[in-house]
Amino acid sequence: LTYKDEPVEAQDTETEKHGKTTVIAAPVAGEIVPIEEVPDATFSEGLLGHGFAVKPEEGRIYAPFDGTCLTIFDTLHALGLKSESGVELLIHVGLETVDLNGAPFKAHVKSGDKIIKGQLLLEFDMDAIRAAGCPTITPVLVTNEDEVGSVVVRDGMIIVGGPEISEASMKMEPQAVAAGE
């Protein structure tokens, strides 16, 4: 995992596993934090994958790309997503939130659902999470880095690149999709 300051240009295009580019919108609005600064070794040491974390400004998780919801945990604290290009992400809302048994969460998708970029996937009550003594910092990890190549975070964006996916970038400002579009 490397961090770069130079801006990155990316195109918002359909993606295939070989050579095209995809823009991946941020799943949650907030301040980006290097994954190494997450106060949980499971995330900070890259045991589940590399990426970044976000200190959320609001309690909403949006689809960062078109693809599929691979899994939503029974406790609703985490989502596994797969883009049409094959990038797999784990979005883990807060730390130790598995112990909250789903109470502060409301899912808008289920495992196996197709998702579209900007679609609301999950809502969470940040005050309830904090009241339970859990940090709200939200790790966002590429879990199949071995298939997509290196993970580089640049100036508020995450870049996934390698021999099979030439580039995918994660913008840090989610946009909701209007109903009916």
Which stretches of residues belong to each language-model region?
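Contiguous, well-folded functional domains in the mature portion of proteins
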Residues: T2-E181
